[in-house]
């Protein structure tokens, strides 16, 4: 699974936990105002977009949701907490 993470200055153990769940490719963009939303692209082959809501600009969140929808890539909006994120990931797996 290839995951694009947007937001959070540092992922900490979240990156390790995602790799343990089978993520072979992890791309991280910090998500604050330093991202140009016109140039924001989802890498080819991305299976999931994860947006850390505590650390992301609202305009970036809207832009990434729209882009992901056009590419039929699922998006998860989550706090930067592994407990909260794992619950969201479980909900997505049950829907699949």
Each model region followed by its residue ranges:
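Ser/Thr/Gly-rich flexible loops in soluble cytosolic domains mediating phosphotransfer, phosphorylation
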Residues: 68-96
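A generic structural signal for well-ordered alpha-helical segments
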Residues: 18-19, 64, 68
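A short, well-structured beta->alpha microelement
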Residues: 24-41
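Short amphipathic alpha-helix with an adjacent loop that forms part of the alpha/beta core around
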Residues: 38-43, 89-93
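Short glycine-rich, flexible loops that bind phosphorylated cofactors or substrates
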Residues: 57-60
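Redox- and metal-dependent alpha/beta enzyme cores, enriched for Fe-S-associated oxidoreductases
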Residues: 1-23, 37-38
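Glycine-rich, N-terminal phosphate-binding loop of Rossmann-like dinucleotide-binding domains
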Residues: 53-54
